[in-house]
Amino acid sequence: MAKKHAGADANDSDYNEEPNFEDPPGFVDTISDEDLLGDMLAQRPSEADGVESVVVVDNIPKVEPVRLEKLKSVINKLFSHCGDIVNVVYPVDEEGKTKGYAFMEYKHASQAEDAVKKLNNHRLDKNHTFAVNLFTDFQKYENIPEKWEPPTIQTFKVQSDLYNFINDPDAYDQYCVAAETAPNCVQVGFWQNTLPEPSELETRERFTDTFVKWSPLGTYVVTFHKPGVAIWGGSNFQKIQKFPHPGTQFVEFSPCENYLVTYGPTPTGQKIIIWDIRTGAEKRSFVADGMSVLSMFRWSHDDKFVARMGENSIHIYETPSFYLLDLKSIKIPGIRGFSWSPTDNVIAYWVEEQNQIPARVTLMEIPKKREIRNKNLFHVADCKLHWQKSGDYLCVKVDRYSKLKKDKKELDVKFLGMFYNFEIFHMREKEIPVDSVEIRELILAFAWEPIGNKFSIIHGEPNSSNVSFYEVNKGVKPSLVKRLEKKSCTHLFWSPRGQFIVMANLTMGTFEFVDSTNDYIISASPDHFRASEVEWDPTGRYVVTGVSSWKVKEDTGFNMYTFQGRIIKRTILKNFVQFLWRPRPPTLLAEEKQKEIKKNLKKYYAVFEQKDRLRLTRASKELLEKRAQLRETFMEYRNKRIAEWKDQKSRRVMLRGHVDTDNLETEEVDEEIVEFLVKEEITLLE
């Protein structure tokens, strides 16, 4: 056995002795368990009384025993969508009649919470709207203190004027330019299109993660972030409201800017949420089905209704309750598409061919649900609905076939001998007459003149297409007024004020500016290589073409032109993302006043020309002042350096062997000429 080293017992006793962590007598701990172990205490198992998964449903119909089973089946089916129901109790009175409320127990508490969220305020019929609450809420409200304490008065915050951008005396338009400075980090600059040079209003670093979007009337600009989206406005673009919807990919404003729709997944499974812009409250949410997620909803022009297409139906919701119109959907078997009129509460939809029944385009008046016009169509493969901005006309582009080929299982359908029709509905005329225009060539693009009675189409082969312009008049068939042949364009962009149009090839980056009132003469044909977007300003005076970094990585930026195609400004901007003009709200002037101004426009010319001259004079004066300031700065710098050079003369003479080289006489200089051969040429003389 090994011997212990001397002093080993003492060392062992030192290591085996437990340290004393007890508080000294009289010690008072000032740190609570919640502050010290808050994260662990939050995970501590809590006592449950077994009612967390129970909901109370009020305002159910009061029925006799003979109708009770039917009531149970309807309500149980509705509430079973939220989870597994373990137990249901419908209290009854002495006569066996229900008392107007029920208790439902779910398998999990989360399912009960989901039922409260989805079915509270659900309308069963005209007389019964559910009030759904958790059973535990009764205990919570029982513990409300009897003594009422008034809420803390919050300081009034003066909101910035959201419409100051339309108060500019010279009516200059605004625009924003976005550029990506880092991944998921976009800088946005706001500018005013002043003359002779644009004026910068505000520049925000890290303003959005992806891109921005203006509201339809230009009041707000929306930015995208991981937690959701935010809207900004006012003179300095302050944050007006934020909407928590993680992963939002796309947003839509209602036409009157009362509501915002966000599209994107969330942890709770909600993909589409409708928000109240002024309060920030969630009005209703939907889960996307197998149909397209983006732009599922269509708004009426006055924000009174919003609609979406379902399977063989249209769901129309009333605002602000967002209940279904008349508490039921409109059943339309075979519906394939629909669209609202931009100026009236009229829906246009089309139905595909079914069982030897022809396809049909229908105009329906809302909220009466009255069909005001029908048009049957034969041999239809597809339809596209195009409303004119003023709501005067509806054009239905019909893709028709001469022959239909199906396989044995009728799963694969091929359309042969394709040709195309334009069905023009005259919305402002009695009984809404319909004219038809047939085109035998492939239709590549269609565009209405926003204010006017013309539409344009691109047709033919993609590499050698034609552009045709049609005019629609009352009582006569639409007439072809001009055809421009062999034009390699892919898109048509009308001015918001009509008359002028840009024919663009967004593959090659070529553009042609056309005046539709001057025999469709091409006034200019500029190029902007790799341009991917075209933006008209709201007044129709300027056009911007842009090369986005989403498409290419080199030579990104934008060009600005007049409505006649004359280049005004070229801007090269690294990682340029998008250019957006700020929309303008409709004018508040009555139509009679507008006509009066147009009639007397000549007398305003002198005032406008005088303003232009003053502006140019002011700009010239500012330029001269700027040049004079630059010259003064240079002369100040020059005189400073000359004085410094003179102060260093003694040092300079000493370093040069006491020879003053600043004032050398020409007699003291020896001139030496050196000649050398630079080039030799041999020329043969005949």
UniProtKB/Swiss-Prot annotation:
Record domain RRM: where: 53-137
WD-type repeats, residues: 203-242, 289-327, 330-365, 438-480, 526-571
Keywords, ordered alphabetically: Coiled coil, Cytoplasm, Initiation factor, Protein biosynthesis, Repeat, RNA-binding, WD repeat
Pfam families membership: eIF2A (PF08662), RRM_1 (PF00076)
Localization per Swiss-Prot or TrEMBL: Cytoplasm
InterPro entries membership: EIF3B, eIF3B_RRM, Nucleotide-bd_a/b_plait_sf, RBD_domain_sf, RRM_dom, TIF_beta_prop-like, WD40/YVTN_repeat-like_dom_sf
Keyword Ion transport recorded: no
Assembly notes: Component of the eukaryotic translation initiation factor 3 (eIF-3) complex. The eIF-3 complex interacts with pix. Interacts with mxt.
Protein name: Eukaryotic translation initiation factor 3 subunit B
